[in-house]
Amino acid sequence: MPTQHILIVEDEPVTRTKLLGYFKGEGYLVTAVGTAAEMEQVLEKEDIQLVLLDINLPDNNGLLLTRELRGHSSIGIILVTGKTDDIDKIVGLEVGADDYVTKPFNPRELLARVRNILSRVNAASSAEDSTKATYRFDGLEFDAPKRQVLGRDGSIIKLTRAEYELLMVFVGHHNQVLNRDRLMNKVTHRSWDPSDRTIDVLVMRLRKKLERDYKSPILFSTVHGEGYLFSGLTK
């Protein structure tokens, strides 16, 4: 497998240098920059598989950058934040980040998260090559290889990697109640923590994109005290 290329976007020089050295030592091809403008230049020229993106950059906001990236790319994104509250984390997931870490972080934990996402990137690419399934539900058509949904009005609804993976879990377990721990493990390969809202945020994102009325969902139902139920699949 070719060396995977990680882009570090961190304005703090010491942290940037440490991350650069650490991931190079783990065998990755690494580019490190300190601004959003530099990040955009690298992305235009290089084949990047994953971005470690600091939320607070001098020339832009990491959350806005994540939203922009997700508009045209399925690249892996891990947000790095210095805040301990959940707001940035939740918003980051809502706009399309794959994961997040809070400073100060353990480099080995960050490495594990990077490996996890890169393995998912590779798995998704392989799945796109081999998966031929199309799923239909409630007037929608989910094209798994293309990782997109044909809307009721004929428009194309694009899915982020995390949304795609969660939807694949749901269509593979139609009419089955899945608890958050099981969903978390299948989508992120981490155990669910009661304070972690990753799955709830992803389900809400799918509801907003796919339900007729996301406030009264019929496809992705909450089973109180247990988890979520996906129903309505016709193929």
Predicted regions and their residues:
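Hydrophobic recognition helices of helix-based DNA-binding modules
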Residues: L118-V121, F170, L210
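Short, positively charged loop/turn segments that connect secondary-structure elements
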Residues: R190-R197
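DNA-binding patch around the recognition helix
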Residues: S125, K132, K158, V201-K235
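Residues within helix-turn-helix
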Residues: R108, D181, R197
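A structural micro-motif at secondary-structure boundaries
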Residues: Y135-Y164, W192, V223, L229-K235
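N-terminal/domain-start alpha-helical segments
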Residues: M1-S125
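Short amphipathic alpha-helical recognition elements used for nucleic-acid or partner binding
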Residues: G154-R190, L206
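Short, flexible helix-to-coil linker/hinge segments that flank and couple to helix-turn-helix
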Residues: L118-K132, A144-P145
